[in-house]
């Protein structure tokens, strides 16, 4: 996450420093700078919107967008970063009001980490269990 598009933002200095530190310590890696959206709720409270809250799913990148001018920039950046993936923009402007976004609502469970007994219960449709 970068904030190049919002130099007056309170997060600008910290994100700029992070980008510079990454360039210094990881020069062999390409950085892709996503813009910083600015979204507030009905009371004017800033919401934690970020284009970096994306999710990779097989050959697709599910990219949160927020009905902001920066959406198009974020899509272009992600197409550059993932040229062999389909970029699927997902409107998260309502979801971010719950203080999370696309990646936040997903649950990644690594293969072979759940107990067989738990999986058996889930296959039967049981979603609440105690063990």
Regions found by a protein language model. Name each.
Residues 1-131:
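Histidine/cysteine-enriched polar flanking segments
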């Amino acid at each position: 996450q970068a904030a190049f598009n919002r130099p007056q933002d309170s997060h600008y200095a910290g994100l700029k420093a992070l980008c510079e530190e990454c360039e210094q310590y990881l020069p062999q890696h390409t950085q892709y700078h996503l813009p910083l959206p600015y979204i507030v709720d009905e009371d004017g409270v800033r919401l934690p919107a970020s284009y970096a809250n994306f999710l990779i799913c097989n050959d697709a990148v599910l990219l949160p967008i927020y009905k902001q001018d920066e959406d198009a920039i974020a899509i272009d950046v992600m197409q550059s970063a993932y040229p062999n993936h389909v970029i699927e923009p997902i409107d998260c402007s309502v979801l971010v009001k719950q203080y999370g976004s696309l990646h936040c609502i997903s649950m990644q469970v690594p293969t072979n980490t759940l107990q067989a007994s738990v999986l058996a219960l889930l296959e039967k449709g049981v979603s609440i269990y105690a063990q």
